[in-house]
C-alpha cells in the first residue's frame, strides 16, 4: 500500500497543487475502500472501471453519516488520476503521429507459424511447390521485388549465385513498439481479413504480460453520433445525463464540484452570494430528482434538508396546478402521453425509485426543467429561513476591529438582507460614514464626492 500511496500523493501534488491531500488522508481513504470491499488491492485504484462505484459509495456514505472527508479526498485523487491519464493519452498520440513509437507486433497467424518449417525445407534443398514467402508476396499489396547484387548472398537460402528465390520479395518487417496507441491496435489485421470494422467500435489490444486480448478504448466519431441522434428526435437535456448511441445514460455528478460547494457552505454560509452563485452554476442545467435530493443532503443539515423537502413539494404542487390547467404545458410533454404528477416530479413513479437511469429515460425535458427550477427556488427560501441575516443597521466597527473586518461584516449583512440591489451600495457607504471609527469617518469625509456621495 505504501507504494500506491506514494504514487497517488505524487500525482496529487502535480495536478492539485496546494489542495493536494496528505499521505495520511490517502492511506485512510484506501483503507476504507478496502474495508468496504470496493478494492481488492490498493493498486486496483488505477483502473478507471472502479472509479464510478467508488464515487457512488463514498457519496452515499457522506449523505448517510454526514462525513465528507473521504469524499473530498477521493475527489482530489480522482481529478489527479484523470489528469494523469489524459496527459498520458495525449503524449501517446503525439508520439504515434510523430513516428516516435507506438503500434504493436501483430499476433502470429497461420502463415507465420508455417514459415520456419518452410525455410528449413529450403535450406535442405527440398523442392517446395509454393513457399510461405511466395504466398506472402502474393498477398502483400504493392510490394516490389528487391534486386539482387553480385556478391550478396540471399537472406532466404544463403546462395550467392543462382538463387531460386531471387524474385521473391520479403514481407515488410513488423512495426515493433510499446503499444502507445492501443485504440488503433488490430486495425490492419481486421482489414487484411476483409472484415469491415464499424466506426467507433472497440478494437482488441494486447495487454503487456498477457497472451490474450482485452478490450481497449474506442475512437468514437461524435459528429456522426450527433447527426444520428438529431435525426431520431429531440435529445434528452437532463444533466448529468450523457446521450449515447443506445440512448440517454445517467452519470454521477463530479465529486470535486460537490465537495467544493460543501466547503463553501461551511465557510460562507447558505446566504452568502458565493454560495448562491455556486449552487446556481451547478443547477444551471436540468438535473434528475435523484441528483437534486442527494445534492441537498450533502450541503444541508438534517433540519434545513427537511425544510427544503417541504418547500420543494410546495413548488412542485404549483407546477402540477399549472400543468393541470394547460394540457400542453411543457411538463405534460406538449400533450403527448400521461400528464405529469407529483410522483413523477419527485422520481417516485414506477421504474424511477432509486433508479437514476430510469429517471433519465422516463422523465420529459419539461419535467426536468420544472424539477430543477423548483428545487433551486426552495433552496433560496430555506437559506433565508435557516440563516436569517443580522440587522445591518446594528453593525458598528469595534474599538480593536480592523476596518477590513468591519467592512466584510457589513457587506455580508447588507447583501444577505432584503434590500433591493440598487440600494445596497448607498447603504454600505452611509454605514461606513456613520458606523466606523472617527479617524475612518474623517478620511471618508475628506474623500472625493464620488466616494461618499
Swiss-Prot record:
Residues 100-150, 187-218 are annotated as: Disordered. InterPro entries: Gag_M, Matrix_HIV/RSV_N, Primate_lentivir_Gag_pol-like, Retrov_capsid_C, Retrov_capsid_N, Retrovr_matrix. One of its GO terms (molecular function) is structural constituent of virion. Keywords: Host-virus interaction, Viral budding, Viral budding via the host ESCRT complexes, Viral matrix protein, Viral release from host cell, Virion. It comes from the Viruses. GO terms for cellular component: virion component. A motif (PPXY motif) lies at residues 172-175. The record marks 155-156, 166-167, 177-178, 239-240 as: Cleavage. GO terms for biological process: viral budding via host ESCRT complex. Residues 112-141 have a biased composition (Basic and acidic residues). This is Gag polyprotein. It comes from Avian myelocytomatosis virus HBI.
